[in-house]
Amino acid sequence: METLLSALATLYANTDREQKLQANNYLEEFQKSPAAWQICFSILNQDDSSIEAKLFAAQTLRQKIVYDFHQLPKETHIEFRNSLLQLFLAAKDSPRPLLVSLAVCMAAIALHMTEWHNVIADVFQACSSKDPSGRCVLQFLSVLPEEASDPRKTSLSWEELCIRVDELLRDNGPAVLELLVQYVDAVRASGSPSSADLGLVLTSLISWLREIPLDKVMASPLIELAFRSLDDDLLLEDAVEFLCALFNETKDVDETTDAILMLYPRLLELQPKLIAACDDPETFRALGRLFAEAGEAWVVLIARMPNDFLPLVNCIAQVAANDTELEAIKFTFAFWWDLKQMVELDVYAEARQLFAPIYLELVRIIVRHLHYPRTEDLAINEQMASNEVLFEDRDAEDRFRSFRHEMGDVLKDCCVVAGVSSCLVQISSQLIKVLKIKESGLPYYWQDVEAPLFALRAIGRMVPANEDQVIGSLFQILPQLPENNKVRYAATLFLGRYTEWTAQHSEFLELQLNYISAGFEVANKEVQSAAAQALKHFCYDCREQLVGHLSQLHMFYLNAKTYLAPDPLMEVAQGLAHIVDIQPVANVYQSVHSFLAPSLQSILLAQVKLNPTQAELEALADNIDIVTIFLSLVHPPSPAGELHPIVRLFQDIWPILSRTLDTFSDVLICERISKLLKNFIYTFKEKAIVTLPVITEALIKGFEKTQYGCFLWVSGACVRQFGVPEMDEQTLSAVWSFVGKQCTNMFYYMSNKNPKEIPDVIDDFFRLMMDALLANPQMVLESQMLESLIQAAMMSLQLEQQEPLQTVLNFLQDLLAFALHTPPYSLIEPLPDSLLKSLADLLLKNSQELYIILFNGMVFTFPRDNISDASAVLIPLIRLVFAADPSLCIKYMSNVLDQLPAMTIGQEEREKFLANFSKHCTSSEMPRLRAHLQDWTAMYRRRVLTPRAKLISDD
């Protein structure tokens, strides 16, 4: 015990992190040991034990009950329970964290000691005599439902858990309600009850709410207690939590109308309190949440009975309007969306008409909340527009920006209910008003311009292209906008959102393009990025109008390339590529070549530089991306049988790209060229077949030289496109010879590397193999390398990264599906039975090793997200083995269980697991078998791998 206490002291002392980690590791191992049971009891029984030691002991006991209950002989369960109950009662006056921890221990023993049948009555009886205050029984009741209903907090099977939950919770709900009512009556009779006691009653009632019939809850005096508690600052949060939980139980309005009609008048009585709380942010936030969650729960009834529930909708609008701290309004967002979803249905047209004015007023409210912070000093306020961050730090700025987009979504809801035109007028009138003030020379704040512009951008997709009342007049006031970065950024993105409208109203095109183009000259990254994004949308949606101006756009591009940052330049290139794409096909080659010429020249210059810097490599990669954009997005139809002009261009520039691969072994450059090749293949498909020989040669050479996975994922594109049975024999032979060479290189690479060192390459390789299986399974299954592939897959199962491991498991799953005559996808022609039998024999040959690897991975090494993938391999493997030899299947499972550490699994548990396993295998209940395996392995992992308590922070 001294070592234990010393480790705890180290954790709480001002020692270095290494010592804390060592102490933490010791304590975690202690928590898993059989000796922990007795030592924890000793600590809790000693009056002189520190509160930290007692808390640790209580937490450890709870973990022992959850994970290691099998370590206690069944004949000791009653004695253990009684001892724990005595400890719990003795702690009635202890600090709350210790009392809560011991209550959780009692809840855990109540769940796992399945032979204990009168839990609530026994605990209540014990507490009545030893703890007249009721703290213990209330604390126990408040934690029991959560502990009992979470499958992650138990070692019981799902069936056992369901039975136990019914016995502990559902059969006791009314009795618990009666007990809570009796407790409240008793404490009131004895004098003035404390807020802490009543808060615990409300917390307990929240925990049990789902287990008690709603009519019994509504008939109890606890409803009155909850509403009265809203006047007590110490009980406000507990009361709101309970009432919100109660509202949530009334969502099925057809079944709970009576309860709603009882609660609704009481809620409306709180409106004066809501208004009075405008200067009390905490109370306003709590009450705002109460009204909003009531609206969410009753939204169906609100749509059906709009006149009756209009006062509630007005109250929720008041929450949005009066929330100066922007803390309560977020609770209303879901309600506005839910109500919109209801009233846009024709059957609720009356409700839509009634609520439209509220939604229109909500537009005004939202625009007001969209404003950036400002200062009354106009000169300083204007300078703020040049600041990158307007809040105390970047995180606060990012949170506000994210919050603005949420409010923008509410504006879209307003458009549906109040009408797009009305919302446009509401927003634009605010913008026009401030611009008139500006034009008259009076002082104004740029925030009053920026917020409506953001709002107009937010509702852009709601505005139809034939709108002819508002948008055109808004575009005409562009010259009146104040010139600062924040306003220009907002206005530019606003223009970019209305490009589909502009395509139908081309008379406004030049005005907007001039405004956007001016943004490129502003020395601000955000403004330039917005201009590039807007121009991209214009080039796509207005390409028919712009194709005649391609020469001017080409000059603009050449100029922009000299000063734009890479990201906005890419967006500009994407936009221009869309215009080039709709030219006559005869002009495409020359046009694309002219846009690519600067990038190709830069690539050539980079090839002769010695020892390029990282910045120079990144610039080279960016130029390769420009080439990728044009080769991917420009693909106009071309006459059948003719070489596509972009394919011809690819052939002409291939020597430059090939020499770049030969010159640079940097992963960044190889990946960018690989991306180019993959996009080119998928864009031009069979038209690109003439380039296949040079591409596959480069991929073989590149992978052999660098072992970069990027060459494998392009190989997969080649196989999927050109390795399918429909291809001619010569192409098929070339493709599968190419696949064989890539496999040979990979096997050699894996023979010299630990798989854990190359997870990404393994991921890319097995993605290639899955592409090969999908393209032509017969070629893969006939391959002489199939056994080597299976061996490589098994070797790769020692990986610990989720994505590559999932890829390997998916590959094995596909192989097993073929072996079981259940191919993972439809085939044009069935595969020969002899081929499938050979595959099955090969898998059976490796079945024991694969069985062990998969099971051990599921219980020890695989990431949690891979467990379902692993079971999707193990289950068909079990089917395959069981069909060949049932006794062998049981033997495999028995052997892997025998290899588990003895103290981690009891004999009774082992026998029960094997019995269920055998039963499910024999009856071919594969879904039940899968659930059985996944539930048990999840429980075992929690027992063995999960840290028993997070005792130190990660920072």
Swiss-Prot record:
GO terms under cellular component: cytoplasm; cytosol; nuclear envelope; nucleus
Pfam families, per the entry: IBN_N, TPR_TNPO3_IPO13_2nd, TPR_TNPO3_IPO13_3rd, TPR_TNPO3_IPO13_4th, Xpo1
Name by which UniProt lists this protein: Uncharacterized protein C11G11.07
GO-annotated molecular function: nuclear import signal receptor activity; small GTPase binding
GO biological process entries: protein import into nucleus; RNA import into nucleus
Disulfide bonds: none
SMART domains: IBN_N
Coiled-coil region list: none
Domain Importin N-terminal positions: 23-90
